[in-house]
Amino acid sequence: MLGKPIVGITAAHCSEELKTFPRHYYVESIKNAGGIPLIIPPVRNTEEAKDVFQLINGLVLTGGGDISPTYLKEDPRRGIGTCFPERDLSEILLTQLALQQDLPLLGICRGIQVLAVAAGGGIYQDIPSQYPNSILHSQTAPRQYPWHDVDIVEDSVLFRLLKKTKIGVNSLHHQAVSEIPQGFIQCALATDGIIEGIEKLRAKFCIGVQWHPESMMETEAHSKALFRGFIEAC
């Protein structure tokens, strides 16, 4: 590929009126790692997703609200937060197409959960009520500061990128992957057993992380390494 890769970044919702917006941290992280960011508003069907894919060399699934139980094929549980089904549909369509085409993909926070659901895995709708012995995963410190440690699986792409077996990460979630999709492995784990990273086997680049590396780009070398590895694969 000639020139810098163009990376699609899924837009987040900020209201029930379905207004969408880009997140500054994601845009700057892609630019600083050597890519060109392109914000993707919600798509409505596979054809629109295919049109988007003609423009991009990689895809970032961003953080945001909860995934609707409709897409989990479950009844809603106590503790579930605000859902935007339009965004859920869009990101699941984009993710499934990325998996089919082996387009480099990085899922962040909500993004790891979308990746798991789109690939046939499962998530906890609410960690405190479904995983009662968990640590606090919704930090009370500013998002650029690490909140807890995660262990990195040595036989993983994530380890080869970060070159560390333990890192400090921020934590801003109450949902998490509960079932790893077929063809994926767990690549990061919190001390309480919550899955913090998954990756697809034999993929060009397909990693989901539960933390927000884009918010720690200025302070944590492992965040820079993750984005650089992603851009190099695009």
What do these predicted ranges mean?
Residues 1-108, 117, 124, 128-161, ...:
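N-terminal beta1-alpha1 cap of cysteine-dependent amidohydrolase-like domains
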Residues 111:
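Active-site helix of classical SDR
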Residues 162-168:
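Catalytic cores of DNA base-excision repair glycosylases
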Residues 171:
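Short basic/aromatic active-site micro-motif
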Residues 207-210:
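Active-site-proximal beta-strand elements of phosphoester/diester hydrolases
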